[in-house]
Amino acid sequence: MFFMNKESYFINLFQNQYIGDDGALLNNTVYSMDAFFENVHFKREWMSLEQIAAKSMLVNISDAIAMNATPKYALLSVAFPSSFTKDDMKELYRGFDKVAKAYGCEIIGGDTIANIKLDISVTIISQTSNPLLRTGIKEGDLIAYTGKLGESKRDL
């Protein structure tokens, strides 16, 4: 909980009308971005590289869907450990590609860098004509979710 207080504090420093939802809405385009870092969000011993890449895409795509937006494009930033082989990179690619294709999302670029562990950041660019915003929620509205709340945190 201590970190979440720091996160909220940091976000509030920007005092920006676009910050505070699952993504930033500008002219019917939703921009969302999440980091997925080794030993923070996942452990490589628990998931295959394909699963790690797929999950990093899915958590970002879910932000777009939560805002009633259709994912169109993705930008990937991947920090590779020096121990990574070409086969490891192909396995990551398969996870990214499989999810992108399943949701009709095209990977259009990004960045790579060497690192001591695997870190991934994904930006999703989505389109919506009828966005759902947190600011519009009111008492009595139906809130829906999938899975079990808190499960990702519990797993680490």
PLM features: residue spans?
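Helix-biased detector of long, well-ordered alpha-helical tracts
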Residues: 1-156
